[in-house]
Structures are given as structure tokens and as C-alpha cells.
Amino acid sequence: MTTIAKILAREILDSRGNPTLEAEVTLDDGSFGRAAVPSGASTGTKEAVELRDGDKTRYLGKGVRHAVDNVNGTIAETLKNFDAADQQGLDRRLIDLDGTENKGRLGANALLGVSLAAAHAVAASRKQPLWQYLSTITEADVALPVPMMNIINGGAHADNNVDFQEFMVLPVGCSSFSEALRAGTEIFHSLKSVLKGHGLSTAVGDEGGFAPDFRSNVEALDTILEAIGKAGYTAGEDILLGLDVASSEFYDNGKYNLVGENKRLTSEQFVDFLADWVAQYPIISIEDGLAEDDWAGWKLLTDRVGKKVQLVGDDLFVTNPKIFKQGIDSGTANAILIKVNQIGTLTETLEAIAMAHAANYASIVSHRSGETEDTTIADIAVATTATQIKTGSLCRSDRVAKYNQLLRIEQALGSGARYAGRDAFVSIKR
């Protein structure tokens, strides 16, 4: 039976040394599931609420004891004897129990931990890997996603002068996920050598990418191109580039403040700036190119380059189906970033991905800068045919854990394993 017998939560640490919540669900048949909740650094203002204690005498106010207590008390009592195989019903019960629009009473971290742990428990009960169980819910074809590998960190993810948060390589020309992972790894090590040769730091940021103090944002792009060539790959053919601009972080009073370029730009000027980069570099994906409240700027960017570049809404959509619908209806962006903790339940996450597929928007399953060894997002990416995954660079075990899980899934699928490759960008013509 998949009836819930016990729910237990605890406070653990994430990859930045901050507390986060881990939940466990045990079923009547003894099957067991566990999930840990990630946490972001650059967050959208409309994200579901991550409940923190605020007690400055403990973990600098970042403890999650209240969220843990909510799981071990109200949530555990309410869901005891509930059928965990009814994922949609379970998540609806959690949402109703919280009773707020932003999950601020019990905490999205409390709800998400239980939601994901329940799915793990049911998969264990059915003796299925999580990706296989989830595919019975989504009814989607399974596919290995293109990894968007964040090899240079800036912005809120690093202590340097680079404004843009992530510079990524996408190995689209490879025949399998394992070959794509190898290509990314070789480029990562090549980049380390290039940085050393230029006398730059090879310290890494929150997501495992290097965080050198470049003089400008464009220097980061040029250095990556050098590393790609040195590793024996061809930029624009084997490897494409992606950016997470995270522009809400440097948007102030209607202007975009680029410290690296010493420029203060209007929305129109910043769209021109990004369009120039697209013309000069093999950039296939731009995330959060405009600020989350600059919908007019987003529309300008979409009209300007949206037919040839993937434009990803992260802070813009915050994995929220209601907000995402506004983007679809207005033709804003052409892809959505999927972060499970932005919305707070597995069901709502899957709903956002299904909406993207129906509207011919690409969906990219993503980690957060504060991660754990939990690998759930790898299984979600495969089970939903999301075609792309963002889970950081090629070092730090909290990032590599997801890549290793994808390798296991690829091996389990055997000859049926399909790598998205160049077909990953469903919203644009290639």
C-alpha cells in the first residue's frame, strides 16, 4: 500500500553552509522517500516563500526550525493515511492546508520537501526509479537533457566585477549525454588552464564555475571561446553559449547598470547591447535578459531576437503557471526556467512544464545556487522531456551529483536513451 504512515523533517545544511529542510515520507509497506529543498541567491520577488526563522542568534537568522515544525506537526498529522500515489491530491491538500497565495504560512520549503519525498516513496514502493515513476504521471517520452554548464560565475553568485551571473556552454553537437558531459568537463579544465595563463584566479563561485575578476563582461565570453578551442571543440558547431544575465540584480530606476562595461542603459539600449552580442557570438540562450518587472523591455527583446535565440524567463515567470500564462498570452520570452522551490509542489512544477510544451515554449529544469546532494531535478528533467538542465559547473559534489544521476539514467535506458542535442531548442528555428 502507498498509504502514508509517517512524515519526518529535519534541518540540514546546503552547499553554502546555510540551513535547509529535508523531509522523509514512509509508507505503510515500509517504502521510504527522502528529499532536500534547495535555496536561491538571486530570487524573483514573486517566488513562493521560503520560511526562515529570523532568529539572529541562530544561523544568522536563516534557520528553518519553524518550517521543520510545520512538517512534523500540522502536515504530518493531516497527511497520515493519505494515499501518496495521488500526487495531485496530496499537493492540493498541502496547498489548501497552507491557505496563502505564496505558501507563506507553512513555507514553500516545508510543502516542497514533503511533496518530493512522497514521490520518492511511491517510486520505491513500485520498485521503479524516480524518473520512470514520474513519466507515468507526465505521460511524456523520456529524453536526456542538454546540460547548460555554468563555467564562469558572476553577479550574485561570485565576488567579482562581472555583472552577468552565469556564462554557460551547451554541448549540442554530441551524440549522447555522456559525451556531452565529457565535452563540458574538458572545456572546464581547459578554461582553468587559460585563466592561469592569463594570471587570473581559478577560485570557484557558488555553482562551481570559475569567478575571475575580468575587466568586463565581454572578456568572459572571449575567454570561454579560447578555452573551447584549446579543448579541441568548435564554438558555434559542437558547443553553443548560454547566458544568465540576471538583470533584475542590476536594474535600478529604469536603467541597467553595467559596472563591467561602465554603462547605464535604458531598456532599449540594453536590448541593443544583447542583440549585438547575439550577432557576434554563438549565443543560443539568454536567461533573464531583462528585469522581472520590465515587461515592455522583455517584449522588445523577444521581438528583436526571439526567433533565433532562446529567451528564458526565470525571475520573470518564477515557475508559476498563473504568471507564465501572462507571458504566453503576450508572446513574451519563448522559454521558462523550472525551479521546484519557486512554486513549492511537484504538481505545480509539472503543470508549468506541460504549459510550456503546449505553447511551444522550451522548459529548462534548474538547480539553485544553494544546493544539496539531492538529485531529484535530474529525474524530473528526463521524465518531462524538458530537453535542457541547469545544474552548475563540473566541480562541487552538489552539482556533479545531478550529472552523475543523469549518467545512471542514460545507462539504465540503454539503447533507448535519446539525447536532446540540437533538437533541445523547441521554441526557435535552427
From Swiss-Prot:
GO cellular component terms given for this protein: cell surface; extracellular region; phosphopyruvate hydratase complex
Pfam families in the cross-refs: Enolase_C, Enolase_N
EC number, as in UniProt: 4.2.1.11
Residues binding (2R)-2-phosphoglycerate: Q165, K339, R368, S369, K390
Entry's localization field: Cytoplasm; Secreted; Cell surface
Ligand binding (Mg(2+)): D244, E287, D314
Stored InterPro entries: Enolase, Enolase-like_C_sf, Enolase-like_N, Enolase_C, Enolase_CS, Enolase_N
Keywords from the UniProt entry: Cytoplasm, Glycolysis, Lyase, Magnesium, Metal-binding, Secreted
Details of cofactor binding: Binds a second Mg(2+) ion via substrate during catalysis.
Biological role: Catalyzes the reversible conversion of 2-phosphoglycerate (2-PG) into phosphoenolpyruvate (PEP). It is essential for the degradation of carbohydrates via glycolysis.
Cross-referenced PANTHER family: ENOLASE
HAMAP family hit by this protein: Enolase (MF_00318)
Subunit organization: Component of the RNA degradosome, a multiprotein complex involved in RNA processing and mRNA degradation.
Name of the protein described by the UniProt record: Enolase
Upper lineage: Bacteria, Pseudomonadati, Pseudomonadota, Gammaproteobacteria, Lysobacterales
